[in-house]
Each structure stands twice: as C-alpha cells, then as structure tokens.
C-alpha cells in the first residue's frame, strides 16, 4: 500500500470519529488495504457483486449483505453510495464506489452511535481522493 493511501485513511479516521474501520477495494475487486480491526476478505464476493450491480429504474437488487458475520440491510443503493444498516443496532456500512459507479470502493464501518449519513459527505470526498491511486 502506498503512503498516500495510508495517509488518506489516517486523515479520514481523524476527521470522522464514528468511522471505526475502513477497507479499500481496488478496481480489480481485490482488497488494497483494511484497518487492522476489520477483515472483509471473506465477504469480498458479495461486496463485489453489490459494486458491480447495475440497477434499472425500479429494480431492487441486493437487499442485504453480511460483513464479518454482521448482517446489514441495504437501505440505499445508488451509483454514488451503498448504505447498509444492521437492524439490531450493531452499526452501519457506507460503501462509496470508486469512481462513482465503478468497481473499486472505500468502505467505512460506522459505529452505532452515529448514522451513516452523518459521515456520508466526508467518506465520499475521501473516496474521490483515491480515484487515481487504486
């Protein structure tokens, strides 16, 4: 992993205290990096399926995904973002495709004390910084 990518992750974690873990998926569908407290390697297949899903107007698509054994209901699925919420209060996942609608992603685990939309702007901005790095 490059120092630039590491710096972007560190900056995001410093700006967003409710982002407890980060993973970055490259445009090739492989893990570029992830924070030590989160391992998405066993869940890459469903994450990549979600990232590569192209929905027509009115189509539902994937309705849930599990990461590290925690199930998240997909509450928003657009080219700009995928938001999943655990209905038992175990937090949220915010997936920002890189580039918008693309196969890479910045994925943030949002702790239960915050809502995913509280972090949305910053996570999307940091995802844009990764476009030419992954």
From Swiss-Prot:
**CC per GO annotation:** cytoplasm; cytoskeleton
* Compartments it resides in: Cytoplasm, Cytoskeleton
- The annotated region (Loki loop) lies at 55-62
Q: Which InterPro entries match?
A: PFN, PFN_sf
Q: Which UniProt keywords apply?
A: Actin-binding, Cytoplasm, Cytoskeleton
- Tell me which domain of life the UniProt entry assigns to the organism this sequence originates from: Archaea
Query: How is this protein's activity controlled?
Result: Inhibition of rabbit actin polymerization is reduced by phosphatidylinositol-(4,5)-P2(1,2-dipalmitoyl), a soluble form of the phospholipid phosphatidylinositol, suggesting an unknown lipid might regulate actin-profilin interaction in vivo.
Q: Which GO terms describe its molecular function?
A: actin binding
Q: What is its main location?
A: cytoplasm
Q: Which residues form a coiled coil?
A: none
Supply the domain comment.
The Loki loop (specific to some members) becomes ordered on binding to rabbit actin.
Miscellaneous comment in the UniProt entry for this protein: It is not clear if Loki profilins 1, 2 and 3 are from the same strain.
The job of this chain, per UniProt, is described as: Binds to actin and affects the structure of the cytoskeleton. At high concentrations inhibits spontaneous rabbit actin nucleation. This strongly suggests this archaea has a profilin-regulated actin system, and actin-type genes can be identified in this organism.
The similarity annotation says: Belongs to the Asgard profilin family.
Name of this chain's protein: Loki profilin-2
Q: Please name the taxonomic classification of the source.
A: Archaea, Promethearchaeati, Promethearchaeota, Promethearchaeia, Promethearchaeales
């Amino acid at each position: 992993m490059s120092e630039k990518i590491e710096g972007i992750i560190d900056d995001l974690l410093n700006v967003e205290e409710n982002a407890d873990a980060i993973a970055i998926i490259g445009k090739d569908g492989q893990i570029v990096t992830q924070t030590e407290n989160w391992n998405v390697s066993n869940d890459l297949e469903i994450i990549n399926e979600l990232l590569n899903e192209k929905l027509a107007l009115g189509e539902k698509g994937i309705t849930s995904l599990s990461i590290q054994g925690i199930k998240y209901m997909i509450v928003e699925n657009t080219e700009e973002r995928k938001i999943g919420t655990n209905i038992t209060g175990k937090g949220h996942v915010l997936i920002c495709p890189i580039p918008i609608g693309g196969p890479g992603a910045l994925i943030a685990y949002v702790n239960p004390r915050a809502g995913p939309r509280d972090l949305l702007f910053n996570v999307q901005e940091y995802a844009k910084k990764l476009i030419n790095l992954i």
